[in-house]
């Protein structure tokens, strides 16, 4: 969240934020894990058995469309996706990709307190210096 807020404040280019919140129909319901969104961004959900579920076709369409449009134009908006505005200072817009898709403003204000309540805090083993930028150090670790 801090990284997105920093990039939005600098405004060198539009900043878009998303949250993949699909619950997979496996092992009684598994929350999305790291990289579980990749098949949908590449329109390959049908090739990954765990992705075969009700929202799969819709996610293939909108997530791959958003990915291609962002790569082509810098703007992820595409047919089938609600209007997705870029983040700006004080307004962090998050597109939720899941059974339904919705653009939420400042969702982190609702979500982060819940995460902090139920998950122990994470301290990176070697935090980046305060003045570290994205091109050096470990600023990419989040």
Per-region residue spans from a language model:
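C-terminal helix-and-tail extensions that cap enzymatic domains
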Residues: 1-142
């Amino acid at each position: 969240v801090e990284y997105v807020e920093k990039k939005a404040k600098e405004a060198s280019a539009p900043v878009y934020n998303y949250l993949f919140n699909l619950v997979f129909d496996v092992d009684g319901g598994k929350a999305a894990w790291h990289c579980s969104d990749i098949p949908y961004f590449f329109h390959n959900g049908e090739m990954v058995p765990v992705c075969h579920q009700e929202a799969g076709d819709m996610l293939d369409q909108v997530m791959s469309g958003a990915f291609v449009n962002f790569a082509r134009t810098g703007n992820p908006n595409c047919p089938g996706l609600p209007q997705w505005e870029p983040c700006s200072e004080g307004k962090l817009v998050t597109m939720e990709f899941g059974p339904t898709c919705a653009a939420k403003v400042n969702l982190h204000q609702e979500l982060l307190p819940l995460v902090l309540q139920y998950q122990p805090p994470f301290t990176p083993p070697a935090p980046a210096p305060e003045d570290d930028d994205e091109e050096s150090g470990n600023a990419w670790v989040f």
